Amino acid sequence: MSEANSTPTATLPSMRVSYEAGSLDEGSLAGTWHEQLALWFEQAVHDPSIHEANAMVLATADADGLPSSRTVLCKGFDARGVVFFTNYTSAKSHDLKVTRFAAATFPWLAMQRQVNVRGTVEKVSQEETAEYWAERPRGSQLGAWASPQSRVVSGRSALESTLNGIERRFADAEKVPVPPHWGGWRIVPESVEFWQGRPDRLHDRLRFRNNDGAWVVERLAP
């Protein structure tokens, strides 16, 4: 058998896991979506099998409806929504400016859980951006100045050359200022779904949905 014919993808149809790690019912659900997210997030943080519990897959679409997804880091959430930070000239930011919608998924696979957030987006305040910026390592701050995110570059050496220039520019600065092209986005949820894997694919799916300002909880078929 040739190497091409022995590809591991031949086993894909038979690859499956039985989900038996837990259950989720209406009676055990917290009173609000953000309280439930905080509960699950805390458990994910303390699960040694989960690395970067705040990683979430962010989905956007451009003006033509062409979708894109990428992993970003959640840097905060509360009753107002879920926050991440990025370059405001990036492809994702361009999508968000055009459509004003986004979806994000926390894939806590080791716990057989997902949380799916869908809604509109808004920029966070300059004060919120400055507060988070101050927490970033200096190297990350300099990198944010140096990277023309999502644009084609001639090679890594070009990025490193730009970074070297930025390092010289701020060499004598005690604090690196926030770039004018950088800041936070908040996903303001219209719905937040909590998914718990169950045996025989009869998964638990409980969704908080904003119904004209009043949140309702609904069970969805798996």
Swiss-Prot record:
It catalyses: pyridoxamine 5'-phosphate + O2 + H2O = pyridoxal 5'-phosphate + H2O2 + NH4(+); pyridoxine 5'-phosphate + O2 = pyridoxal 5'-phosphate + H2O2. The keyword Oxidoreductase applies. Its cofactor is FMN. One of its GO terms (molecular function) is pyridoxamine phosphate oxidase activity. It holds the Pfam family PNPOx_N. One of its GO terms (biological process) is pyridoxine biosynthetic process. Signal peptide: none annotated. Pathway: Cofactor metabolism; pyridoxal 5'-phosphate salvage; pyridoxal 5'-phosphate from pyridoxamine 5'-phosphate: step 1/1; Cofactor metabolism; pyridoxal 5'-phosphate salvage; pyridoxal 5'-phosphate from pyridoxine 5'-phosphate: step 1/1. FMN binds at residues 70-75, 85-86, 92, 114, 149-150, 195, 205. Keywords: Flavoprotein, FMN, Oxidoreductase, Pyridoxine biosynthesis. The keyword Lyase does not apply. Substrate binds at residues 16-19, 75, 132, 136, 140, 201-203. Binds 1 FMN per subunit. Gene3D superfamilies: Electron Transport, Fmn-binding Protein, Chain A (2.30.110.10). Its EC number is 1.4.3.5. InterPro entries: Pyridox_Oxase, Pyridox_Oxase_CS, Pyridox_Oxase_N, Pyridoxamine_oxidase_dimer_C, Split_barrel_FMN-bd. Belongs to the pyridoxamine 5'-phosphate oxidase family. Catalyzes the oxidation of either pyridoxine 5'-phosphate (PNP) or pyridoxamine 5'-phosphate (PMP) into pyridoxal 5'-phosphate (PLP). Homodimer. This is Pyridoxine/pyridoxamine 5'-phosphate oxidase. The gene is pdxH.
